[in-house]
């Protein structure tokens, strides 16, 4: 008969959120797996000190239950980290699986948690339902004897996604339970030994008293004691047999009831697929080594893809992304297309030959739109036409400024105009490129500066003319004077013909080129004459005295005829210019009128909507019309006054010049010496005389013609002018009355 060994027991005192929840007592199956039970018992008592790898005490005290899965299990035992990644056995690190004899066939079993085969450490779990799917993977080494309700309370705690309970479930204290049955047996043995000694003492006293008796009684007592011992042994054997039978009889119904209970117990509703995996212990590993299963799966997937897609073909997902151009090329990659191949058909693609991308071409087109369109192509020397186009597009205020400048030009003499035109041509040639680049706003400033420069150039030209005339009079001879006169005639005829014709841009170019050539010829000839003068002075001095007497009469007659012809030509030019100006002014005035009528037509629709504003605008227009008419009348009066003054001054000049001529003729006849004649020739050269006489004749002819025009004006025109002036005055008075009678308007009306 083998003696039955009692299994070791351990306990946990558990607290939830630092509040004691109760004690759980475990019975360890030391007979089935002694090594695992010894590991658990030592961790409960903490008798093994610190761990080799973790360097922490090998003790479950103050350890957490870090993983709780309802209807499955409650896990703990990670004393190093407290999250399921730590722990260590008393043997150092991990130890092997000992036995899978006991199955997970009931609830409240104590089993070892691991990370795979032979990876048992300090972590354990208590099942709350039968879990047969864990058989063969985890070693069962104990069961819960008492404290099942505490385990249920831990199971019912709320958890997060990682199955960690929100409440802190901690082991306050733990240890081993020693059974009391051993102490009782020892006490019983001691009690039996004491009773047997007392009985032996009593027997010895009785023997001493009866020593006197006979030896027969002694032998009889010995036999009786032997019989008693035999009987006692027999009885003890019988009792033992009976006890064994009773125990067997008790065990058989209990085993049947246990089997029935196992069948009646509900199995776990949790599937093994739903159980979350146990976190791996990676410790200091930066990258975990790839598993063999994962490698095999990847290899299988690659083989399937190769079988489905041959080496030349591409996957379907990428084939959808590829775009094909017109030429048949596949476009790979992401993002918008920046370049494309040219189409083979010319009709399809407009920009077949251009290599610039479309987005670049769009930017170029936008930049071209921003450039100012200059209209017609600019020809060399056409600055005046461009200025006229720009001035026509401007407001009527600028037209009035033009009229004032035109009046100033009228008052100037024709000789000065010719000289100004020559200078203006040089100035125009220099400033052609500048004027093209400038805008319309800069053109206004340029015109104003031009008017100022003309005034300055007049004074300079006068001083230059005087100095040149003196030098030429002293140097040039009569033969040179004749040549100069003939050239001047030809130029005058050419200028009159060209001015009578309508001016074209090509004609202007020809005029400018001719004037430049003439000026160059005159300069070259003057230089030649200066060189030859010094040689010919002696010869000419002798011939002058002889020829003067003969040529005086001829020269006087010829000069008169020339002066008359020149005066006629110039009067014609003046008339043509005045007519042209009047026409241009009338055209500009008609344009201005048409613009005003258009504005009035547009404003009528607005006036219907807003009658108050239309009245104020009508008043402003009337005032402007009246002011413009008054200005025109004042300008015409100033013209008449200026012409009359010019005629008077010309008459006075003629009288004074006639007196001077008679006086000089008498002096010339009376003088006998040649020296006086030479001095008179130096003081007054024939060129200067001809210029003065020509100027006088021109002024006379212009004044006479102006007087004739004024006389020939019909009385009907005068009456029309008077009636127009009366109407304007009448309108002006009405406007004033309306302004006085009307209510106080806005700031705009007052300013208008």
Curated annotation (Swiss-Prot):
It comes from the Eukaryota. Keywords: Isomerase, Isopeptide bond, Nucleus, Phosphoprotein, Rotamase, Ubl conjugation. Its EC number is 5.2.1.8. GO terms for biological process: protein folding. Residues 182-752 are annotated as: Disordered. GO terms for molecular function: peptidyl-prolyl cis-trans isomerase activity. Residues 290-308, 346-366, 377-447, 462-552, 577-598, 626-684, 706-752 have a biased composition (Basic and acidic residues). Residues 11-176 form the PPIase cyclophilin-type domain. The keyword Ubl conjugation applies. Inhibited by cyclosporin A (CsA). The modification Phosphoserine is found at residues 252, 254-255, 257, 288, 313, 354, 384, 395, 411, 413, 685, 688, 694, 742-743, 751. Residues 182-193, 226-251, 327-345, 448-461, 599-625 have a biased composition (Basic residues). PPIase that catalyzes the cis-trans isomerization of proline imidic peptide bonds in oligopeptides and may therefore assist protein folding. May be implicated in the folding, transport, and assembly of proteins. May play an important role in the regulation of pre-mRNA splicing. The RS domain is required for the interaction with the phosphorylated C-terminal domain of RNA polymerase II. This is Peptidyl-prolyl cis-trans isomerase G. The lineage of its organism: Eukaryota, Metazoa, Chordata, Craniata, Vertebrata. The gene is Ppig.
């Amino acid at each position: 008969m083998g003696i039955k060994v009692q299994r070791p027991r351990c306990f946990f005192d558990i607290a939830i959120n630092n509040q004691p929840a109760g004690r759980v007592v475990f019975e360890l199956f030391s007979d089935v797996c002694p090594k695992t039970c010894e590991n658990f018992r030592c961790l409960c008592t903490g008798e093994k000190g610190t761990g080799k790898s973790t360097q922490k005490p090998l003790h479950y005290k103050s350890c957490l239950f870090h993983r709780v899965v309802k209807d499955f299990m409650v896990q703990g035992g990670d004393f190093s980290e407290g999250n399921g990644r730590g722990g260590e056995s008393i043997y150092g690190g991990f130890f092997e699986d000992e036995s899978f004899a006991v199955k997970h066939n009931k609830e409240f079993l104590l089993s070892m948690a691991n990370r795979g085969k032979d990876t048992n450490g300090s972590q354990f779990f208590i099942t709350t339902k039968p879990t047969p799917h864990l058989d063969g993977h985890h070693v069962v080494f104990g069961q819960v004897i008492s404290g099942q309700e505490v385990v249920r309370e831990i199971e019912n705690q709320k958890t997060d996604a990682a199955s960690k309970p929100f409440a802190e479930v901690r082991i306050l204290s733990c240890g081993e339970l020693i059974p009391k049955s051993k102490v009782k047996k020892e006490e019983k043995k001691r009690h039996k030994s004491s009773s047997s000694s007392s009985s032996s003492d009593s027997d010895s006293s009785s023997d001493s008293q009866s020593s006197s008796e006979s030896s027969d009684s002694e032998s009889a007592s010995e036999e009786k004691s032997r019989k008693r011992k035999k009987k006692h042994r027999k009885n003890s054997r019988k009792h033992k047999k009976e006890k064994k039978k009773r125990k067997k009889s008790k065990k058989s119904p209990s085993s049947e009831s246990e089997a029935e209970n196992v069948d009646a117990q509900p199995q776990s509703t949790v599937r093994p697929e739903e159980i979350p995996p146990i976190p791996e212990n990676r410790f200091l590993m930066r990258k975990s080594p790839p598993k063999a299963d994962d490698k095999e799966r990847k290899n299988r997937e690659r083989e399937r893809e190769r079988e489905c897609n041959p080496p030349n073909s591409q996957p379907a997902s990428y084939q959808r992304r590829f775009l094909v151009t017109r030429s048949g090329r596949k476009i790979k990659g992401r993002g918008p297309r920046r370049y494309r191949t040219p189409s083979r058909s010319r009709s399809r693609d407009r920009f077949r030959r251009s290599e610039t991308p479309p987005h670049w071409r769009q930017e170029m087109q936008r930049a071209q739109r921003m450039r100012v369109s200059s209209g017609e192509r600019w020809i060399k020397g056409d600055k005046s036409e461009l200025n006229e186009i720009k001035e026509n597009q401007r407001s009527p205020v600028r037209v009035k400024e033009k009229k004032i400048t035109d009046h100033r030009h009228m008052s100037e003499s024709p000789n000065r105009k010719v000289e100004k035109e020559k200078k203006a041509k040089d100035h125009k040639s220099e400033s052609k490129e500048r004027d093209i680049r400038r805008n319309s706003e800069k053109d206004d400033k340029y015109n104003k500066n031009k008017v100022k420069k003309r005034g300055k150039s007049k004074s300079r030209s006068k001083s230059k003319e005087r100095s040149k005339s003196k030098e030429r009079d002293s140097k040039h001879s009569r033969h040179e004077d004749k040549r100069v006169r003939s050239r001047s005639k030809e130029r005058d005829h050419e200028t009159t013909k060209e001015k009578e014709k309508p001016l074209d841009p090509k004609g202007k170019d020809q005029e400018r080129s001719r004037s430049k050539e003439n000026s160059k010829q005159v300069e070259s000839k003057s230089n030649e004459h200066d060189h030859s003068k010094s040689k010919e002075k002696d010869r000419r001095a002798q011939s002058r005295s002889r020829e003067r007497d003969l040529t005086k009469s001829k020269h006087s007659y010829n000069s008169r005829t020339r002066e008359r012809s020149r005066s006629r030509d110039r009067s014609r030019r003046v008339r043509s210019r005045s007519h042209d100006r009047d026409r241009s002014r009338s055209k500009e005035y008609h344009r201005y009128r048409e613009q005003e009528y258009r504005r009035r037509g547009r404003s009528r629709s607005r006036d219907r909507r807003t009658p108050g504003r239309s009245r104020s605008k009508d008043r402003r227009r009337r005032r402007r019309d009246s002011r413009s008419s008054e200005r025109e009348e004042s300008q015409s009066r100033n013209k008449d006054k200026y012409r009359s003054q010019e005629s008077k001054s010309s008459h006075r000049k003629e009288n004074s010049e006639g007196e001077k001529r008679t006086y000089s003729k008498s002096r010339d006849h009376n003088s006998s010496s040649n020296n006086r004649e030479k001095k008179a020739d130096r003081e007054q050269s024939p060129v200067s005389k001809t210029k003065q006489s020509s100027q006088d004749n021109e002024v006379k002819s212009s004044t006479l013609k102006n007087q004739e025009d004024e006389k020939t004006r019909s009385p009907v025109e005068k009456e029309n002018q008077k009636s127009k002036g009366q109407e304007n005055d009448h309108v002006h008075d009405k406007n004033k009355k309306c302004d006085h009678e009307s209510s106080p308007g806005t700031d705009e009306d007052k300013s208008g």
